[in-house]
């Protein structure tokens, strides 16, 4: 693994950990981190799956030098793969009665608090 890739991986894990703490401080319960539905299924990894009350959020974390660039980094193809991962999670762990699911994005930029963009997109589910 190249050095720049390792640094990116380390930065991504740090950003996810920061988001987990931010979510916990705001009343969320973390159900899973880096959830994968399995190799060869076409489903991507969901960075964080969190629950507050009857709401389950599938959260993609992006760390970039500028917040706007972080949002651009989530492509339509990536959204579809994350949605498939969410469907696989819900297949194993169904929503609570009258529960809801949504897709959120958390953006990490230098010298700023994490930004939690709620209901960032809708697909399937």
UniProtKB/Swiss-Prot annotation:
Intrachain S-S bonds: none
Coiled-coil stretches noted in the UniProt entry, renumbered to this chain: none
SUPFAM superfamilies linked: Restriction endonuclease-like
Pfam families found in the cross-reference section: UPF0102
Matching InterPro entries: Restrct_endonuc-II-like, tRNA_endonuc-like_dom_sf, UPF0102_YraN-like
Annotated GO MF terms: nucleic acid binding
Domain of life: Bacteria
UniProt family annotation: Belongs to the UPF0102 family.
Name of the protein in its database record: UPF0102 protein Rru_A3692
Organism: Rhodospirillum rubrum (strain ATCC 11170 / ATH 1.1.1 / DSM 467 / LMG 4362 / NCIMB 8255 / S1)
